[in-house]
């Protein structure tokens, strides 16, 4: 039986095991004794390691921060790092996000592509390599993390208690290969003076706000003017209601990952833009539209920048009101050639005026491997040898992965170019055919890395 037939024969088993992982709500929870990230991530890690044990692998649980499955012998380690935690569900799902649902080649559920499915693809690639009798001159270790979506503290713990990887990849991005990841700048915007009664929207820092509700004092004719300008927007849905001297504006935009905000429609930004167009005069509305807005390029705070690997992007993910102060999250992906001190210099003097202020929470450096580095070449060759695709080339992305937390690895698959898998959105899915191909690619990748 050739390898493709073997993978085909394992498809139902892979999907059953994926269903076991998808059924676990592994969002970041409340820490408890022995469970630093709460019940869900710990349960997902336990199940992931159990599946690896059932497939015959040695497993280690590193204090419920993360764990790993391993095969082979030797001092050097080829590492694969995936994650079992998920982002909040959010949005309007057509399927139960915690029940694997198959329709033809499509399999729906939260975490199917980000990143529970890819963890299993790598695990089955390891199984098939082991069963084929290939010589393992190094150890091959699949690390299962629990907080990639919320800061990767799991990998901080790994670095403290476990061995450094010689080389490897994280199956948490796109094919053909990711040789760079933009830097991350996180900010908060705050109101100083505002007539807005309440503002609520978004559910995570790193996704475009897909729904919001803004409540403002009623003004004569404002409801009608708002309805007129909202009708001209790209919102999927909106509703303006007036009662008890207040106007409530509900807006439903389009979700997107913070690394690609132009693919979404920011419900908050559109609402604030429409408030201004409708003649609602407010200090924070003016501040927001001037400094944040809907353009996604950072020009409002002096950060518009493009290099040969991509442009700077800005995403407003959440808004809330607390103690009469409105706050907004700002997630900025910084091109790989732009250093953190340059970022601070560019936006200096642009972050505050009489209407509001923006505070820098932190700046994370970019990751970059030269295109011709041995690691990039080894992984890209695995992809092209299996798929025959030489048109798509190694790229730089705005997303951040475990490659920034672990030494000597880069992101590699499994998303195929041109397909929106709806990660961080409703109806996230993975393709069964894509899973089979990814297993093949990861088998080749591991063999190539064993030879470095």
Model-derived features with residue positions:
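Acidic-glycine-rich active-site phosphate/pyrophosphate-binding loop
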Residues: 87-102, 184-185, 189-191, 241-253, ...
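A common structural junction motif
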Residues: 85, 230-238, 278-279, 349-355, ...
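An extended, acidic, His-containing surface patch that forms the Zn2+-binding/catalytic region
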Residues: 255-323, 329, 333-345, 357-452
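Active-site metal-coordination/substrate-binding segment of hydrolases
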Residues: 54, 77-144, 150, 161-165, ...
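Buried hydrophobic packing segments
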Residues: 48, 119-129, 158, 271-275, ...
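Phosphate-handling active-site elements
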Residues: 103-105, 125-141, 225, 278-285, ...
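Acidic/His- and Gly-rich active-site-bordering loop/insert found
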Residues: 2-110, 134-136, 251
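Midchain, well-structured core segments that form catalytic/ion-binding scaffolds
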Residues: 149, 155-335
């Amino acid at each position: 039986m050739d390898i493709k037939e073997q993978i085909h024969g394992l498809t139902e088993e892979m999907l059953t095991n994926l269903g076991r992982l998808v059924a676990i709500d592994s969002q970041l929870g409340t820490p408890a004794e022995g469970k630093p990230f709460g019940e869900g991530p710990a349960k997902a890690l336990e199940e992931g390691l159990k599946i690896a044990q059932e497939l015959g692998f040695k497993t280690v649980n590193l204090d419920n921060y993360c764990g790993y499955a391993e095969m082979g012998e030797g001092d050097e380690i080829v590492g694969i790092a995936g994650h079992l935690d998920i982002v909040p569900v959010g949005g309007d799902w057509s399927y139960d996000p915690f029940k694997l649902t198959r329709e033809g080649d499509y399999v729906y559920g939260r975490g199917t592509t980000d990143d529970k499915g890819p963890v299993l693809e790598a695990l089955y690639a390891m199984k098939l390599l082991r069963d084929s009798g290939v010589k393992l001159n190094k150890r091959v270790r699949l690390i299962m993390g629990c907080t990639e979506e919320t800061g990767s503290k799991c990998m901080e713990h790994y670095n403290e208690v476990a061995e450094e990887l010689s080389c490897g990849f994280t199956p948490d991005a796109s094919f053909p290969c990711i040789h760079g990841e933009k830097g991350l700048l996180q900010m908060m915007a705050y109101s100083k003076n505002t007539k807005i009664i309440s503002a609520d929207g978004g559910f995570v820092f790193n996704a475009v706000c897909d729904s919001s509700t803004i409540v403002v004092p009623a003004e004569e004719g404002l409801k009608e003017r708002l309805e007129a300008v909202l009708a001209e927007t790209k919102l999927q849905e909106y509703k303006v209601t007036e009662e008890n001297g207040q106007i409530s504006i509900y807006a439903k935009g389009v979700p997107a990952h913070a690394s690609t905000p132009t693919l979404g429609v920011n419900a908050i930004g559109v609402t604030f833009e429409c408030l201004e167009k409708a003649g609602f005069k407010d200090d924070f509305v003016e501040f927001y539209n001037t400094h944040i807005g809907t353009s996604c390029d950072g020009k409002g705070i002096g950060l518009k920048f493009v290099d040969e690997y991509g442009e700077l992007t800005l995403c407003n993910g959440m808004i809330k009101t607390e103690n009469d102060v409105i706050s907004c999250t700002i997630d900025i992906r910084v091109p790989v050639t732009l250093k953190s001190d340059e970022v601070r210099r560019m936006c200096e003097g642009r972050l505050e005026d009489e209407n509001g202020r923006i505070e820098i929470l932190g700046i994370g450096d970019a990751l970059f491997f030269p295109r011709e580095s041995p690691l990039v070449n080894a992984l890209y060759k695995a992809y092209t040898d299996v798929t025959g695709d030489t048109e798509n080339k190694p790229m730089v992305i705005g997303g951040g992965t475990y490659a920034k937390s672990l030494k000597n690895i880069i992101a590699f698959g499994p998303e195929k170019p041109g397909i929106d898998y709806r990660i961080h959105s409703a109806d996230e899915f993975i393709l069964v055919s894509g899973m089979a191909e990814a297993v093949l690619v990861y088998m080749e990748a591991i063999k190539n890395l064993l030879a470095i």
